[in-house]
Amino acid sequence: MDHLAHHYHAHIAELNRRVAEIVSREALSGLVIHSGQPHRMFLDDINYPFKANPHFKAWLPVLDNPNCWLVVNGRDKPQLIFYHPVDFWHKVSDVPEMFWTEHFEIKLLTKADKVAELLPSDITNWAYLGEHLDVAEVLGFTSRNPDSVMSYLHFHRTTKTEYELECMRRANQIAVQGHLAAKNAFYNGASEFEIQQQYLSAVGQGENEVPYGNIIALNQNAAILHYTALEHQNPARRLSFLIDAGASYFGYASDITRTYAFEKNRFDELITAMNKAQLELIDMMRPGVRYPDLHLATHGKVAQMLLDFELATGDAQGLVDQGITSAFFPHGLGHMLGLQVHDVGGFAFDERGTHIPAPEAHPFLRCTRILAPNQVLTMEPGLYIIDTLLNELKQDSRDQQINWRTVDELRPFGGIRIEDNVIVHQDRNENMTRELGLA
């Protein structure tokens, strides 16, 4: 933890520098960042799981305590208004005593609706950052999530501090242990539900603590890109396993995917080919490279796999140009990663929020940035047998280029995705996922 504390000092200094710059530019007194409030289920007395505002998490690892506030201006010591009620019904969060507390002036809030007493006396020139605009209006904030401030913060959040990079390495390290446990469970006959339980046990995090709903897909379920239903019963025949699952550390996410074949067969060979292609794509990452160019290169590699495994005929570029590869690989190559799984800033050309749209032929690409040092991105090429997409190919001349017998052979396996989390450095790439032990 001493290593993390050392980096945290510089992290706070950088966040203060960013705030000082944007509040000066926008002639604001400062920013008031709200952790969030509980959301009550309709007609019930139970709240949905609480998720803290990522702008709040950027400053400190208070992840599970609603009704907290940060008051920052980039000059003075940041103020943390920490919610600490008198409550015999629920567990009250302990007053923090970790290494990061020395960087904050901490005030305790015992009643959520009394926060105005602890906020700046005149907040008319302070900007509110958070979800609850109705609360901000009642408190008197006239500037609520201003576009200029949000765009600036989102653009710069893509450049990670050393503290953030270390948190993300630890999030990867934790997730790797879960992936190894899940792989073992698959080969030992566990159901989707049982694999999920073993994964969560290995990472030591509950369903509401991991950064997103895990995808635990056996056989043809792997063709559903965001499959989150967990079947309790095993399929009649065990063929394949796709797991897309991460872990959290101090609010930062990992996002890792692997695909396994139960037996050595054609599908297993396809996994090997995809793994090779993914590593080649990662080798192409460097500062100055346009992420959309990597995505287009992925389609070229998918096209070659379609030819090599006799899924399609023709030439590789023709398969890309006709949209055939998009039927087999319909999603983007990856995305920014950080405080959020699909982190902000992936389309920002500059700190004013100038938008770089995804290519018209590839609307699901989540990042169009030029790569730069200290960015963290996922690299997740895939190849799937998705009938709703492949059926579109049957409606025109592209039908003649598809080897439907091979498609039928691979359909029960669902699909393949392989995903690593990569730091772009000035002179190299750091594949956290591989370097921390997941082949």
Curated annotation (Swiss-Prot):
Top-level EC class: hydrolase
Biological role: Splits dipeptides with a prolyl residue in the C-terminal position.
Annotated binding of Mn(2+) 2, by residue: 244, 255, 419
Top-level taxon of origin: Bacteria
One GO cellular component term: cytosol
HAMAP family to which the protein is assigned, alphabetical: X_Pro_dipeptid
Note on cofactor: Binds 2 manganese ions per subunit.
Family that this chain belongs to: Belongs to the peptidase M24B family. Bacterial-type prolidase subfamily.
Required cofactor names: Mn(2+)
Coiled coil start-end: none
Catalyzed chemical reaction(s): Xaa-L-Pro dipeptide + H2O = an L-alpha-amino acid + L-proline
Originating organism: Shewanella sp. (strain MR-4)
Transmembrane residue ranges: none
Pfam families linked: PepQ_N (PF21216), Peptidase_M24 (PF00557)
Entries under InterPro entries matching the protein: Creatin/AminoP/Spt16_N (IPR029149), Creatinase/aminopeptidase-like (IPR036005), PepQ_N (IPR048819), Pept_M24 (IPR000994), Peptidase_M24B_aminopep-P_CS (IPR001131), X-Pro_dipept-like (IPR052433), X_Pro_dipept (IPR022846)
Lineage: Bacteria, Pseudomonadati, Pseudomonadota, Gammaproteobacteria, Alteromonadales
Protein name as it appears in the record: Xaa-Pro dipeptidase
PROSITE patterns, per the entry: PROLINE_PEPTIDASE
Binding site for Mn(2+) 1: 255, 335, 380, 419
Keywords: Dipeptidase, Hydrolase, Manganese, Metal-binding, Metalloprotease, Protease
MF GO annotations: aminopeptidase activity; metal ion binding; metalloexopeptidase activity; phosphoric triester hydrolase activity; proline dipeptidase activity
Entry EC number(s): 3.4.13.9
GO terms, biological process: proteolysis
